[in-house]
From Swiss-Prot:
Protein's UniProt name: Glutamyl-tRNA(Gln) amidotransferase subunit A
Record carries keyword Cell membrane: no
InterPro entries: Amidase, Amidase_CS, Amidase_dom, AS_sf, GatA
Family of this protein: Belongs to the amidase family. GatA subfamily.
Catalytic residues (UniProt): 79, 159, 183
Native source species: Brucella suis (strain ATCC 23445 / NCTC 10510)
Length: 493
């Protein structure tokens, strides 16, 4: 059965088309793999055995009739942030206990319309707030990778840690994820998978639990660049239910793979050389530059002067929006309810019991920066900085730069329950140092594995593109992937 779960989406698609395998066989292989591994990895918070089998059966019937969709019979995992009709959707928070929506998110509806099969809901940081998948009410996810000669558990990154771990451990063919400040790209880099955060507005946010509405964007995590391109094509669409959704044709992203990057101008931002960055990250970056240079790309030095303000500005804007978005969870209509002596007390008791520590921290920060005395000093200033960050990118792209190459993360995956990071949230927030600028500017960014560190752990590079030019990112990322190879963890679970 493991040979079936080893197939990429592209390989499985071809075998299903040729009737060499059935969707039912493929789905059963994944369900068996999940049942055997999930206690160890904790990637899934709900496994939809019956639904998966009935969807696979329907796929087999459509294939037999010659009516196969673009993702017909491909088994996928869904981050617990996406509404799935009648199925556990709790954003991995205690406050949404037992919530099963009556509607389907646009992203998942698009995937099911193309014939994909749902295996279940994937673990994540609570309300997508975290960089290590340790804030989930359902416990942490373990990275399928381990350092050479060590049995120590590592984090898979966050907030889409369940998505990245499930893809890396072959517990789904691909997964949906979301990215508010790096939540697709950082876990992808930590697990040796490919993750793309599309341009803001390219993929509908309707039916996705909101964290920071002006920053959130859904995208796929997959095993390789081709699979990410295939999933992206099915995910992206115009959606009138999302006012920020953009009416642009969805290109065939897969067709961009294999196109030459000869003459493409790749920018290298000097501000991304941060103090204390490990030598192996700098080495990897140089390797990536060489891969693109060898393929004919032109490498140019660029400056993004406001980069150093991105992280502090992000940790004002995102919590401010979160404090507003999370005000709706009060125990009245759905989810957890803790009784109180009156309605105000019930609200307080429910929110105190329902939200985890990190979520409470961000609600408090957000409420503080939006309060009358501090709005101008913090929130308004952060929004002005955001405009300057966006202008930095616009200036660079106006000079003819096609894409920007940076490291995806400042390190490889770190240990689970790291005491230093647990006691210093700012150190944890620094994990997003290379990724937040992309969300602040609404641009597309892709993380692609480019090598292993000295301990045998995966490291990723990030490519940042012009708005709505995801094709360029797939094109350049494919060049890096072809040169660097693909990376799979040794099985310990």
């Amino acid at each position: 059965m493991s040979e079936l779960t080893a197939l990429t989406i592209a390989e499985a698609r071809d075998k299903l088309k040729a009737k060499a395998i059935t969707a039912t066989e493929l789905t059963d292989a994944y369900l068996s793999a999940i049942d055997a591994a999930n206690d160890a990895i904790n990637a899934y918070v709900a496994v939809t055995h019956d639904q998966a089998r009935s969807m696979a059966k329907a796929s087999d019937e459509r294939i037999a009739k010659g009516e196969a969709g673009a993702l017909e019979g491909i088994p996928l995992g869904v981050k617990d942030l996406f509404a799935t009709k009648g199925v556990h959707t709790q954003a991995c928070s205690h406050i949404l206990d037992g919530f099963k929506p009556e509607y389907e998110s646009t992203v998942t509806a698009n995937l099911w319309a193309d014939g994909a099969v749902m295996l279940g809901k994937l673990n994540m940081d609570e309300f997508a707030m975290g960089s290590s998948n340790e804030t989930s009410y359902y416990g942490p996810v373990k990275n399928p990778w381990r350092a050479k000669g060590s049995n120590a558990d590592l984090v898979p990154g966050g907030s889409s840690g369940g998505s990245a771990a499930a893809v890396a451990a072959h517990l789904c063919a691909g997964a949906t994820a979301t990215d508010t400040g790096g939540s697709i790209r950082q876990p992808a880099a930590f697990t040796g998978t490919v993750g793309i955060k599309p341009t803001y507005g390219r993929v509908s946010r309707w039916g996705t639990v909101a964290f920071a509405s002006s920053l959130d964007q859904a995208g796929p995590i997959a095993r390789d660049v081709r699979d990410a391109a295939i999933l992206m094509k099915s995910t992206a669409s115009l959606d009138l239910k999302d006012t920020t959704s953009v009416d642009l044709p969805v290109p065939d992203y897969e067709a961009a793979l294999g196109r030459s990057v000869k003459g493409m101008k790749i920018g290298i931002p000097r501000e991304y050389r941060v103090d204390g960055m490990p030598g192996e990250i700098e080495e990897l970056w140089q390797k990536g530059i060489q891969y693109l240079k060898d393929a004919g790309a032109e490498i140019v030095d660029i400056s993004l002067p406001h980069t150093k303000y991105a992280l502090p500005a992000y940790y004002i804007v995102a919590p401010a929006e979160a404090s507003s978005n999370l005000a709706r969870y009060d125990g009245v209509r759905y989810g957890l309810r803790v009784p109180g002596k009156d309605i105000a007390d019930m609200y307080e008791q429910t929110r105190a019991a329902g939200f985890g520590k990190e979520v409470k921290r961000r609600i408090m920060i957000g409420t503080y920066v939006l309060s009358a005395g501090y709005y101008d000093a913090y929130y308004l200033r952060a929004q002005k900085v955001r405009t300057l960050i966006k202008k930095d990118f616009e200036d660079v792209f106006a000079k003819g730069v096609d894409a920007i190459l940076t490291p995806a993360t400042p390190s490889a995956a770190f240990g689970l329950a790291d005491e230093v990071l647990a006691n210093d949230p700012v150190k944890m927030y620094l994990n997003d140092i290379f990724t937040v600028t992309v969300n602040m500017a609404g641009l597309p960014g892709i993380a692609v594995p480019a090598g292993l560190n000295g301990q045998g752990l995966p490291l990723g590079l990030q490519l940042i593109g012009r708005p709505f030019e995801e094709e360029t990112l797939f094109q350049a990322a494919h060049v890096i992937e072809q040169a660097a190879g693909r990376f799979t963890p040794a099985k310990w679970w």
